[in-house]
Amino acid sequence: DAQIVDVRGKLLFPGFIDAHTHMALEVSDTITADKFETGTKAELAGGTTCIVDYATQYKGESLREALNNWHKKADGQSSCDYAFHLALTDWNEEISRELEEIVQKETCSFKLYMTYDTMVDDETMYEILSRLKELGGIAGVHCENNGIIQARLKELEKTKGGRTDVSDYPWTRPKEAEAEAVARLLKIAKCVDTPVVVVHLSTAAGYREILRAREEGQTVYVETCPQYLLMDESKYSLPAEEARHYMIAPPLRKKKNQEVLWQALKEGRIQTIATDHCSFTKEQKMAGAEDFSKTPCGMPGAEERPALIWQFGVNGERITAEQMCIYLSENPAKLYKLYPWKGALIPGSDADIVVWNPDTEWTMTAENQQSACDYCPMEGTKICGRAEQVYLRGRLVAENGKILEEKSGVYVRHGVK
């Protein structure tokens, strides 16, 4: 009685995993355009069958309260499977005690910020990394030096009388801010003697700090994103309204950084490619018209990631199809304890399958995307290859960008037990 699907001439991938998303995130006095309902449809359309979203513990909250808040946003709304990282912003003895149960039963992975209002200082970073080492968890860290960013924002106010020129944005978050924060994180991690994840690496300067630490024997996992591989800071010289669409943090960098990141992927020195999907509409992006520091930072990318890595990575002969599978599926599954249920096509795994047609020609447009965002950062990009069919736990749920079955995603625990 088995249904037979003819996939001759196609590639089969284990369902892709996007281990860096921000759905229904409240930030910059607004909330992301994509809630779990639309954001996970976008993921599914592109071939992603599981996301790991950042639940955030706000000041004064317990870790359980933070997770419950995210369950209210995600449960019953998600079209792909979903797990959570937990961003830690408030640290004390009570939270340290509570962490044990969370690491055992819910999530092995946590987020720390070195900038923003949610940042942790070096002492807190040391304490959290030490506790995670005890419990078997791991931290992914947003690496930018907050002092440099704040000083340059103030400097711009003094020298130019305001912050309206978006072309000044990358100057306020220079490559040195990333490199210094990466270096500092890795020194702290070395003192603790524990691995860490550097998320959304954007610069050659930051990468050099990682290589240096690895040469000294440290284990450092690295994530980058399609935007840092394919776009550059010239986007900030577009007319202001459009330039704000590309305001992300870390910002887009000089083009020369791209080949360093691609080479690192070719050599297997970067472990995962995620999206940092954090979408806002054109209207939401207008919030920074008088002061770009008030523009909500983030861009969409959920649906586009696999196709972009295929087109510019595999078709562009920078990486192989096998490496694409490793960076988009196998490695994130292994890193975040989702393997072998996710990230593999083996007996006993979840039967999350992407049937990839390498010959389908199509063009990326906002008009045809599932995201609630009303623009596509790669608008007009011509692609050869796409997720023709997407199976979630054995059920056909998407075909050629169209969603066939909504809201069938389930919550995936990935604690160490």
Regions found by a protein language model. Name each.
Residues 10-37:
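Di-metal (Zn2+ and/or Mg2+/Mn2+) metal-binding site signature of metallo-dependent hydrolases
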Residues 18-21, 48-53, 79, 159-170:
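Gly-rich Lys/Arg/Thr-decorated short loops/hinges at beta-loop-alpha junctions or inter-strand turns
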Residues 287-291, 347-413:
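C-terminal cap of metal-dependent C-N hydrolases
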Residues 29-83, 89-108, 126-134, 176, ...:
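Alpha-helical scaffold segments that flank or form the walls of functional sites
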Residues 164-193, 245-246, 266-267, 271-273, ...:
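His/Asp/Glu-enriched, well-ordered alpha-helical/loop segment
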Residues 1-14, 414:
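Histidine-rich, glycine-flanked metal-binding segment
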Residues 9, 20, 43, 47, ...:
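Divalent metal-coordination and catalytic microenvironments
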Residues 94-273:
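Histidine/acidic residue-rich metal-binding segments in metalloenzymes
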